[in-house]
Amino acid sequence: MLGTKRHWPPGPSLSLELPLALTLLALRAGWAQEGTEPVLLEGECLVVCEPGRAAAGGPGGAALGEAPPGRVAFAAVRSHHHEPAGEIGNGTSGAIYFDQVLVNEGGGFDRTSGSFVAPVRGVYSFRFHVVKVYNRQTVQVSLMLNTWPVVSAFANDPDVTREAATSSVLLPLDPGDRVSLRLRRGNLLGGWKYSSFSGFLIFPL
């Protein structure tokens, strides 16, 4: 039409909107290839949800600001001597009790029985350190899972007065499984808190 003029290039608004739209399309295509979807919030930062990661507050995840589930840890010590136990193999074995509980996160350690009862299913780490009283005496300590011995430690050097029987182990436990220490032989020296028992949850299953 006469008197009509075309203005090219387009005005500033169109020239800015077109590259922005192309950029967003390119980003969306890249995220689609990687299996992620962008979430665009007006006036906010770009949030990307990664595949395979549990949503906050959902199964397997915790909301921001909340403590992770399944925090379990304990540590206990003795403050006095332990009574002698029978020789191994004669059917007698004594439970080792700990009268001072230093840590009991999750409430799994029972001071009355000297046992740890798993509150959640998971992989746990346990460690014990037992010191014998006299030389020329053997100390044998077994870590028990319910009624089964898992590991044992010995201290039997006749020339050493204070020798430690120490061991550690990783165990998968179900809720209600009980872990304790049994003195199979000898005396324990706990007068200066030398004997100890501790454990913690590495990760839940």
Swiss-Prot record:
PROSITE patterns the UniProt entry points to: C1Q
SUPFAM superfamilies from the UniProt entry: TNF-like
InterPro entries: C1q_dom (IPR001073), Cerebellin_Synaptic_Org (IPR050822), Tumour_necrosis_fac-like_dom (IPR008983)
Main location: endoplasmic reticulum
GO biological process: maintenance of synapse structure
Alphabetized Pfam families for the sequence: C1q (PF00386)
Protein's recorded name: Cerebellin-3
